[in-house]
Amino acid sequence: YRTANVRRKSGNMSKYICVFCDERKESDTAHLINGKIGICRHCFENLDKTAYASPYQGTEHIAFTMSPFEYTKSMRKVILDLKFSNCKAYAKLLADMKNYLDSYDIWDTFDYIVPVPLHKKRLRERGYNQSELIAKEVAEYLKIPMRTDLLIRTKATKKQSSLVRTERVTNVQSAFKCTEKCDGKKILLFDDIYTTGNTAQSCARELANNGAEQICALTLAIHVQIKLPIIAY
């Protein structure tokens, strides 16, 4: 993905570059940022949708979760560029794929959207929280206030992607802390990827323990090997 990123930063940018197929395209799409990068019509129409674009069953502290796209090789490339190659414009681009949210009239029930926080050490290293950047765009679209101060990460955890499933559970246990009570609040928790769900569950447990009435989770993509029952909402 780094080689592709170098190509995007160099050369003539009179035509935009599709961040998924990495090809130079004519302006055939509304999914375009600053006239330079975007998602071409073909890639957008062929994004791997999941059954989890509808609300699916949550966990002990999560009422339901939504994950509209599969975490495919191309989606992984774009998210990694956003995370590690300082391609912050991709956050707006990814959030621009939010038309799938329009099918549901549940969003005005939430008091806050809360992005999963980074530990301050990792935030200093990276310079930004990619989930927060995407959540900001989604929050503006859904007209839900975003709170980045309600939940903090107190434990410098290892990267979940580097751990086996059993290690991921203990890695994020007691890793988050609420900065204030949230009695009776309905909170939409946002993260970029749903893998095992341990990070979201750890966040939700802390929010619930501090009085949140309901926590739901929204992620951009999900590993398709995750099997969860679909629920009607």
Outline where the language-model segments fall.
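Glycine-rich phosphate/pyrophosphate-handling loop used in enzymes and phosphotransfer proteins
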Residues: Y1-F190, T195-Y233
